[in-house]
Amino acid sequence: MPSSQAHSAVDTPIENHFPGSLFMVVAPSGAGKSTLVNALLAQDPSIRLSVSATTRKPRPGEQHGREYNFMTVDEFKACRDRGEFLEWAEVHGNYYATSRVWIEEQMRAGTDVLLEIDWQGAQQVHRRFANAVEIFILPPSLTALEDRLKKRGQDEPNVIVRRLLAAGSEMAHAPEADYVIINEVFEAALAELRTVVQAARLRYMAQKARHAELFVELGIH
């Protein structure tokens, strides 16, 4: 989700010992996060993208349930008040949120879940899922970041300036991540992202959750 003040909707922390893993990809706008994530999903059918809810208007080409679950402000607030969100934030006058129930259902079923999220949202998710894997995507330079924002043609010049100003404070939180990928050469960055995902799947607790019966049989606790 875009960066702004995030709010935790769940206060009870748990260790993520579900069969499925939870990945969070964080980046400033223009770093190439969505392009990398889409390529990863196309190559790895074992991961499902968590689709955020938002009250903003759809952009050209966006579809409900694919890029976002679009809803009215009243619908959003009703879901929030029922405790259906893991975290939520107000960004530039629009609301965004992550579904808690859906994520837990997927991971219990053994499916890996990936969140495209801002650093503040990642902090809130860690409060619920201590073992979530955070991956921070960085641009190769500030000049490259500005060029990418201009070339994608989605924002007015004043919005681009605002995004560049925000990028500095966002990237200052890269040390909080478990892994950092510099997206200079796309193919190399994608390979690194796939490596991170595979490494996380091989962690002891992740393997134990996926192969619980085997670990019991082998006497491993």
Curated annotation (Swiss-Prot):
Chief location: cytoplasm
Keyword field contains rRNA-binding: no
Gene Ontology molecular functions: ATP binding; guanylate kinase activity
Entry's EC annotation: 2.7.4.8
Stored Pfam families: Guanylate_kin
Domain Guanylate kinase-like: residue ranges: 20-198
Compartment list: Cytoplasm
Keyword Transferase attributed: yes
Any one GO cellular component localisation term in the record: cytosol
Keywords associated with the record: ATP-binding, Cytoplasm, Kinase, Nucleotide-binding, Transferase
SMART domains cross-referenced by the UniProt entry: GuKc
Binding-site positions, ATP: 27-34
PROSITE patterns, sorted: GUANYLATE_KINASE_1 (PS00856), GUANYLATE_KINASE_2 (PS50052)
Family in the record: Belongs to the guanylate kinase family.
HAMAP family documented for this protein: Guanylate_kinase (MF_00328)
Primary role: Essential for recycling GMP and indirectly, cGMP.
Record-given protein name: Guanylate kinase
Organism annotation: Ralstonia nicotianae (strain ATCC BAA-1114 / GMI1000)
Name of the encoding gene: gmk
